[in-house]
């Protein structure tokens, strides 16, 4: 089951609103937008804390488990935010993957910035 389908099932099971679109004027339900955005911010903070704890103690199994749990929670609430407003994040993620895989130089090798970030290729 794709993550978007899981997000929609969760919203349905728990009586959470699902809008079919965002209007041309922006988010059409400010209460829903603010709630979902607050959840993403909360989970992002928890994820970053777990990442710092794992960085400080990379061999600690509890830190590893907590990092994975917080990463999953963050992804879940981002999917919830998108599902609530009718966005298909699975399709968007497929497009990002395809775009990222095209980031090769003319020689077929990745191009890196000094800090290690992969840069877009000529195509």
Task: Set out the residue ranges of the language-model regions.
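Flexible "arm" and connector segments at domain edges
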Residues: 1-71, 75-123
């Amino acid at each position: 089951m794709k993550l978007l389908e899981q997000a929609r099932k969760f919203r349905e099971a728990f009586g959470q609103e699902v809008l079919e679109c965002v209007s041309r004027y922006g988010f059409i339900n400010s209460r829903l937008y603010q709630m979902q955005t607050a959840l993403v911010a909360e989970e992002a903070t928890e994820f970053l804390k777990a990442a710092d704890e794992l960085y400080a103690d990379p061999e600690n199994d509890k830190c590893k488990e907590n990092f994975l749990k917080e990463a999953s929670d963050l992804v879940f609430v981002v999917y919830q935010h998108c599902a609530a407003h009718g966005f298909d994040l699975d399709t968007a993620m497929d497009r990002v993957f395809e775009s990222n895989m095209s980031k090769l130089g003319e020689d077929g090798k990745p191009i890196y910035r000094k800090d290690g970030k992969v840069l877009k290729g000529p195509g």
